[in-house]
Regions:
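Extreme N-terminal starter segment of soluble prokaryotic enzymes
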Residues: 1-5
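Structural signature of beta-strand start/N-cap positions in the alpha/beta core
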Residues: 27, 42, 77-79
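Acyltransferase
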Residues: 189-212
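Short, surface-exposed beta-strand/loop micro-motifs that present aromatic residues
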Residues: 175-182
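Pocket-forming structural segment of enzyme catalytic cores
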Residues: 92-172
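Short acidic low-complexity segments
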Residues: 28-38
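Cysteine-nucleophile active-site neighborhood
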Residues: 49-127
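Short acidic/histidine-rich motifs immediately flanking catalytic phosphotransfer sites
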Residues: 37-47
Length: 212
Protein backbone atom coordinates (compact mmCIF):
# COMPACT_ATOMS: atom_id res chain seq x y z
CA UNK A 1 0.00 0.00 0.00
CA UNK A 2 1.30 3.43 -0.96
CA UNK A 3 1.31 6.27 1.56
CA UNK A 4 0.48 9.35 -0.47
CA UNK A 5 1.21 12.94 0.52
CA UNK A 6 -1.26 15.31 -1.17
CA UNK A 7 0.12 18.85 -1.07
CA UNK A 8 -2.38 21.53 -0.08
CA UNK A 9 -0.93 25.01 -0.64
CA UNK A 10 -4.12 26.93 -0.06
CA UNK A 11 -5.77 27.36 -3.47
CA UNK A 12 -6.21 23.76 -4.58
CA UNK A 13 -9.10 21.42 -3.95
CA UNK A 14 -7.63 18.23 -2.50
CA UNK A 15 -10.80 16.42 -1.44
CA UNK A 16 -11.53 14.71 -4.75
CA UNK A 17 -7.87 13.70 -5.11
CA UNK A 18 -7.87 12.22 -1.62
CA UNK A 19 -11.07 10.33 -2.36
CA UNK A 20 -9.55 8.89 -5.54
CA UNK A 21 -6.41 7.73 -3.72
CA UNK A 22 -8.46 6.05 -1.01
CA UNK A 23 -10.77 4.49 -3.60
CA UNK A 24 -7.67 2.88 -5.13
CA UNK A 25 -6.96 1.31 -1.74
CA UNK A 26 -4.07 3.51 -0.61
CA UNK A 27 -3.47 5.83 2.34
CA UNK A 28 -3.78 9.58 1.69
CA UNK A 29 -2.34 12.31 3.92
CA UNK A 30 -3.06 15.97 3.17
CA UNK A 31 -0.08 18.14 4.03
CA UNK A 32 0.51 21.91 4.07
CA UNK A 33 4.27 21.72 4.39
CA UNK A 34 7.08 19.30 5.10
CA UNK A 35 5.04 17.23 7.56
CA UNK A 36 3.79 14.00 6.06
CA UNK A 37 6.04 14.14 3.01
CA UNK A 38 9.06 12.56 4.68
CA UNK A 39 7.07 9.41 5.46
CA UNK A 40 5.25 9.29 2.11
CA UNK A 41 6.06 6.88 -0.69
CA UNK A 42 4.32 9.01 -3.35
CA UNK A 43 3.49 12.72 -3.71
CA UNK A 44 0.59 14.39 -5.52
CA UNK A 45 0.58 18.11 -6.38
CA UNK A 46 -2.97 19.16 -7.39
CA UNK A 47 -3.83 22.63 -8.55
CA UNK A 48 -6.55 25.02 -9.64
CA UNK A 49 -6.42 28.79 -10.11
CA UNK A 50 -3.69 31.16 -11.27
CA UNK A 51 -0.06 30.18 -11.83
CA UNK A 52 1.46 33.25 -10.13
CA UNK A 53 -0.70 32.96 -7.02
CA UNK A 54 0.09 29.26 -6.71
CA UNK A 55 3.85 29.74 -7.03
CA UNK A 56 3.80 32.51 -4.43
CA UNK A 57 2.02 30.27 -1.93
CA UNK A 58 4.35 27.37 -2.68
CA UNK A 59 7.44 29.52 -2.16
CA UNK A 60 6.03 31.24 0.93
CA UNK A 61 5.55 27.81 2.53
CA UNK A 62 8.94 26.54 1.41
CA UNK A 63 7.28 23.80 -0.61
CA UNK A 64 9.58 24.37 -3.59
CA UNK A 65 12.52 23.31 -1.42
CA UNK A 66 10.55 20.41 0.05
CA UNK A 67 9.75 19.15 -3.46
CA UNK A 68 13.36 19.53 -4.53
CA UNK A 69 14.51 17.38 -1.61
CA UNK A 70 11.77 14.78 -1.83
CA UNK A 71 11.45 14.45 -5.60
CA UNK A 72 14.80 15.45 -7.09
CA UNK A 73 17.07 14.14 -4.32
CA UNK A 74 15.11 11.33 -2.64
CA UNK A 75 13.49 10.21 -5.91
CA UNK A 76 9.91 9.91 -4.68
CA UNK A 77 7.31 9.60 -7.46
CA UNK A 78 5.42 12.85 -8.08
CA UNK A 79 2.08 13.24 -9.87
CA UNK A 80 1.22 16.86 -10.70
CA UNK A 81 -2.37 17.54 -11.80
CA UNK A 82 -3.79 20.36 -13.98
CA UNK A 83 -2.26 23.61 -12.68
CA UNK A 84 0.10 21.39 -10.70
CA UNK A 85 1.49 20.07 -13.99
CA UNK A 86 1.96 23.61 -15.28
CA UNK A 87 3.88 24.53 -12.12
CA UNK A 88 6.50 21.94 -13.12
CA UNK A 89 7.52 24.20 -16.02
CA UNK A 90 10.20 26.88 -16.06
CA UNK A 91 7.87 29.80 -16.84
CA UNK A 92 4.25 30.78 -17.53
CA UNK A 93 2.84 33.69 -19.50
CA UNK A 94 -0.37 33.65 -17.43
CA UNK A 95 -1.04 37.23 -16.29
CA UNK A 96 2.54 38.14 -17.19
CA UNK A 97 3.19 41.76 -16.20
CA UNK A 98 4.93 43.73 -18.92
CA UNK A 99 5.99 40.57 -20.68
CA UNK A 100 7.83 39.25 -17.61
CA UNK A 101 6.81 35.62 -17.18
CA UNK A 102 6.22 33.94 -13.82
CA UNK A 103 8.90 31.47 -12.75
CA UNK A 104 7.80 27.89 -12.07
CA UNK A 105 9.45 24.96 -10.31
CA UNK A 106 11.59 24.18 -13.35
CA UNK A 107 11.33 20.40 -12.95
CA UNK A 108 10.39 19.99 -16.63
CA UNK A 109 12.10 21.91 -19.44
CA UNK A 110 8.95 23.65 -20.63
CA UNK A 111 7.03 26.91 -20.74
CA UNK A 112 3.29 27.45 -20.21
CA UNK A 113 1.41 29.32 -22.91
CA UNK A 114 -2.20 30.37 -23.40
CA UNK A 115 -4.34 28.13 -25.56
CA UNK A 116 -4.87 29.68 -28.99
CA UNK A 117 -7.04 27.23 -30.97
CA UNK A 118 -7.18 27.83 -34.70
CA UNK A 119 -10.95 27.29 -34.73
CA UNK A 120 -12.63 30.52 -33.48
CA UNK A 121 -15.69 28.53 -32.40
CA UNK A 122 -13.69 26.67 -29.76
CA UNK A 123 -14.11 28.38 -26.42
CA UNK A 124 -11.50 29.02 -23.75
CA UNK A 125 -11.20 27.45 -21.24
CA UNK A 126 -10.97 24.01 -22.77
CA UNK A 127 -13.56 22.31 -20.59
CA UNK A 128 -14.93 18.79 -20.78
CA UNK A 129 -13.97 15.33 -21.95
CA UNK A 130 -11.29 14.83 -24.55
CA UNK A 131 -9.37 11.86 -25.88
CA UNK A 132 -5.61 11.70 -25.70
CA UNK A 133 -3.17 10.04 -28.05
CA UNK A 134 -0.38 8.03 -26.44
CA UNK A 135 2.95 9.07 -27.92
CA UNK A 136 5.14 6.63 -26.03
CA UNK A 137 4.93 3.88 -23.44
CA UNK A 138 5.00 4.82 -19.77
CA UNK A 139 3.97 3.01 -16.56
CA UNK A 140 1.31 5.69 -15.92
CA UNK A 141 -0.63 4.24 -18.89
CA UNK A 142 0.20 0.59 -18.25
CA UNK A 143 -2.46 -1.83 -19.52
CA UNK A 144 -4.77 1.02 -20.55
CA UNK A 145 -6.58 0.49 -23.84
CA UNK A 146 -6.36 3.16 -26.52
CA UNK A 147 -10.17 3.29 -26.40
CA UNK A 148 -10.07 4.13 -22.68
CA UNK A 149 -7.96 7.28 -22.89
CA UNK A 150 -10.68 9.91 -22.42
CA UNK A 151 -10.13 12.37 -19.58
CA UNK A 152 -11.71 15.50 -18.12
CA UNK A 153 -9.99 18.83 -18.85
CA UNK A 154 -10.50 22.35 -17.46
CA UNK A 155 -7.75 24.78 -18.47
CA UNK A 156 -6.86 27.89 -20.45
CA UNK A 157 -3.09 27.37 -20.59
CA UNK A 158 -0.95 24.43 -21.63
CA UNK A 159 2.64 23.29 -21.40
CA UNK A 160 5.02 23.57 -24.34
CA UNK A 161 7.93 21.18 -23.80
CA UNK A 162 11.44 21.79 -25.11
CA UNK A 163 12.11 18.06 -25.24
CA UNK A 164 9.46 16.06 -27.10
CA UNK A 165 10.62 12.94 -25.27
CA UNK A 166 9.03 14.41 -22.12
CA UNK A 167 5.57 14.26 -23.75
CA UNK A 168 3.74 10.98 -23.11
CA UNK A 169 0.25 11.94 -24.30
CA UNK A 170 -1.34 14.67 -26.36
CA UNK A 171 -4.89 15.93 -26.90
CA UNK A 172 -6.30 18.09 -29.69
CA UNK A 173 -8.34 21.23 -29.15
CA UNK A 174 -7.89 23.31 -32.28
CA UNK A 175 -4.17 22.79 -31.64
CA UNK A 176 -1.96 20.19 -30.05
CA UNK A 177 -2.33 20.15 -26.26
CA UNK A 178 0.26 18.49 -24.04
CA UNK A 179 -1.83 16.15 -21.88
CA UNK A 180 0.77 14.02 -20.06
CA UNK A 181 4.43 14.74 -19.39
CA UNK A 182 6.97 12.52 -17.68
CA UNK A 183 10.64 12.65 -16.81
CA UNK A 184 12.39 10.26 -14.45
CA UNK A 185 10.16 9.99 -11.33
CA UNK A 186 7.92 12.94 -12.29
CA UNK A 187 4.57 12.75 -14.10
CA UNK A 188 2.14 15.55 -14.91
CA UNK A 189 -1.40 15.41 -16.28
CA UNK A 190 -3.14 18.47 -17.69
CA UNK A 191 -6.48 16.75 -17.15
CA UNK A 192 -8.02 15.75 -13.81
CA UNK A 193 -7.69 11.98 -13.31
CA UNK A 194 -9.71 12.25 -10.09
CA UNK A 195 -12.66 13.56 -12.17
CA UNK A 196 -12.19 11.20 -15.11
CA UNK A 197 -14.17 8.22 -13.83
CA UNK A 198 -12.85 4.76 -14.79
CA UNK A 199 -9.98 5.95 -16.98
CA UNK A 200 -8.82 8.37 -14.31
CA UNK A 201 -8.95 5.76 -11.56
CA UNK A 202 -6.98 3.34 -13.72
CA UNK A 203 -4.30 5.98 -14.35
CA UNK A 204 -4.22 6.95 -10.67
CA UNK A 205 -3.85 3.30 -9.69
CA UNK A 206 -0.93 2.94 -12.11
CA UNK A 207 0.80 5.91 -10.50
CA UNK A 208 0.30 4.58 -6.99
CA UNK A 209 1.86 1.24 -7.98
CA UNK A 210 4.78 2.91 -9.77
CA UNK A 211 8.20 2.64 -8.17
CA UNK A 212 10.70 4.24 -10.57
Amino acid sequence: MARVAIIDYGINNVRSVRNAVEYCGHEAVVTHGNEGIADASHIILPGVGAFGDAMKKIRDRGLDEVLARSVCEAGKPLLAVCLGMQLLAKTSEEHADGGVFFQGLGLIEADVRRLRPKDPDLKIPHMGWNNITKLREHPILANMRETNLAFYFVHSFAMSCENEDDVVGRATYGQDVTAIVARDNIVGTQFHPEKSQDSGIELMSNFLQWNP
